[in-house]
Amino acid sequence: MASTYRTTIRANTYQFRETTMIDPKKIEQIARQVHESMPKGIREFGEDIEKKIRQTLQSQLTRLDLVSREEFDVQTQVLLRTREKLALLEQRLSELEARDKPEEVKPAPAIPPVDPQQE
């Protein structure tokens, strides 16, 4: 049973490392899974143990460099607006460069050298 408990903890820890956002529902689910994987005698302590597991998970997760879903969504929108502005600026720059680019200057026709004796 102890190995099942450790496996569950490792799997859940790996899951959280793979995500960058804290989802309260996910914390509840993990706390429930940990609680259910405990031996029956410990599980009988009930809701108190589950609350402590949830609190421990949340405190450990706050020590990680994670962002909330709201903050992630805000940064996603900022990035999209920045990309749009960049695309517009690149297009404008191309237009300005094309407009200001001098026409290709054709070299003047070569003038044959003047031979002083022919004059």
UniProtKB/Swiss-Prot annotation:
Cell compartments where the protein resides: Cytoplasm
Compositional bias annotation for Pro residues: 109-119
Single biological process term from Gene Ontology: ubiquinone biosynthetic process
Protein name per the record: Ubiquinone biosynthesis accessory factor UbiK
Organism: Salmonella typhimurium (strain LT2 / SGSC1412 / ATCC 700720)
Keyword DNA-binding: no
Upper taxonomic lineage: Bacteria, Pseudomonadati, Pseudomonadota, Gammaproteobacteria, Enterobacterales
Sequence segments annotated as region (Disordered): 96-119
GO CC term (a single one): cytosol
Pathway membership, UniProt: Cofactor biosynthesis; ubiquinone biosynthesis
Family: Belongs to the UbiK family.
Any Pfam family matching the protein: BMFP
Keyword flag Cell inner membrane: no
Gene designation per UniProt: ubiK
InterPro entries from the UniProt entry: UbiK
Record's keyword terms, sorted: Coiled coil, Cytoplasm, Ubiquinone biosynthesis
Positions in coiled-coil regions: 79-99
Inactivation phenotype: Mutant is growth-deficient under aerobic conditions and is impaired to replicate at physiological and high temperatures. Mutant is defective for proliferation in macrophages and mice infection and has a severe attenuation in virulence in the murine model when inoculated both orally and intraperitoneally. Deletion inhibits colonization and invasion of four human cell lines, impairs flagella formation, activates the expression of type-1 fimbriae-like structures on the cell surface, enhances biofilm formation and reduces bacterial motility. The deletion mutant is menaquinone-deficient.
Record's compositionally biased regions (Basic and acidic residues): 96-106
